[in-house]
């Protein structure tokens, strides 16, 4: 269902965001403290807009698919979830650019949610994962307001179902709408619903699974050494080997060697 809202104009000036272009994707050359400060200042204006959480895989996909690249560049910003992206950015002179992951952003926002009064809607994943996620939120983030959760069917939605979801999220009065459909599906979904969903949409991929305890995150030393991809590869070798081998090679050739 392609109803991208061409008329949508961001209420926040994009020139406020330092940007490094890597393989055609405009990546925010930022870090977590900057992003949290930005979020707190502009959360009301960000309603209806979306943010991509970008890594090497999504950047290579964007390089090969102009329509997906337009989606990555069509939101308020694309943050550098992948360590290699921030490394390339720093080499290109963006000294403040640091790896800023989706799961970490979600956690940082949850930490300040009770005092800020933020309401959260979680869209994606399975009902079982959403139940576990709810347990984690209740236990680890007391006072956090969950406005709603919904696990959509895997098949394409009808116009009526889609409209019902838009209405359901609107009625929830959520400030944040966290999307856990995985790339590239979640980014395309956010772009199609830009200006239709009330709340700030953030595509956080596996963050629901991390918080629910389905997938363990890499130890901190591996995260800091940009080796989280290797840890994920050891967890799911069949699913991830081809993807990592192909995209990492393509990224190194284009972004690192050719300077794209």
Residues of each region from the PLM?
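Short, flexible loop segments at boundaries between secondary-structure elements
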Residues: 151-157, 199-235
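Proline-aspartate-enriched helix->loop->beta-strand connector
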Residues: 169-178, 182-183
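Conserved beta-alpha
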Residues: 86-168, 172
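N-terminal nucleotide/polyanion-binding subdomain common to many enzyme families
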Residues: 2-104
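A transmembrane-helix-recognition feature enriched in membrane-embedded lipid enzymes
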Residues: 84-89, 217-260
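Short glycine-rich anion-binding loops that position phosphate/pyrophosphate groups of nucleotides
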Residues: 55-59, 181-186, 207
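Short Gly/Thr/Asp-enriched flexible loops that form oxyanion-binding sites at enzyme active sites
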Residues: 134, 187-196
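Short gly/pro/ser/thr-enriched loop/turn and capping motifs at secondary-structure boundaries
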Residues: 85-87, 185, 207-212
